[in-house]
């Protein structure tokens, strides 16, 4: 129980830091003219929708994924410190905020490696939220250019002197049932699947395990090429909206940017829902601002739809809350978790194997469950031999 309480506190702090980060983002030059009047409501709604969404269950309830939630907590706190640094006029306060930004970045990086994308996220915030991409434009260009060139030189140097070490991480594919090429081709479908889970978090679509058909070429399965093209289209849409609709650009590009480490070339498992914990942080911002715009429009026209809008909003939040509660019921015990996964990923041997072990050896094991455990294990063995 203590582990879950700490995880919940981390989640609560992450939501609070996200609230303040959005609150101050809406005070940046590109956004304050449109959104500063209702920024408290927008920030609260956006952070709340993120916090109560069922897809966050795995990152919060799964004790091992404290690394993901802690990384996200320090990550968003680092962004908050950066924004405060940009807003501050006093030199001492700016230095303090900048040190906080660096320290929390290191803490995020120490929690989980996907926090390495923070510099790119800060650059994205600069591009979307500030009219002039500078603190003296030329100096910033020189700085970021030097960073990129320095990283490239470092990678090339290490590769030149120790090519085996540089690409040793590729050896991980020896223990995976897929190749590097198959992973790269498959991941666009998975990232779009993540997006669909966030937009339509139906209970039967959320699981600790998912059946994944590997993409072996652009046309096998046929959804591979459309998924790649749609992913590129969404990223292109985000880039094209940097000036016109910066909130959409920030939400879309932040999502894809922070999936790069875990959803590209590194030989990790293909799909896990907790990987959306950090990338989804700004995805609900366009929804919140869209609701605010629609409400203001109806209020200006003196239409009775404002009450209906709030009713729909309450219905949405209650639905998400119920979905999260239902999802947590599946995580109540190891047996309930893997029974749930067995139903939702019937072609995967892992849920069957783990469930059989829990029924045979686990705390809930009884003599009457042995036969069921053996039957499930035989099914797992059959699937693994396919």
Where do the model's predicted regions map?
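Polytopic membrane enzymes that build or remodel cell-surface glycoconjugates and lipids
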Residues: 1-386
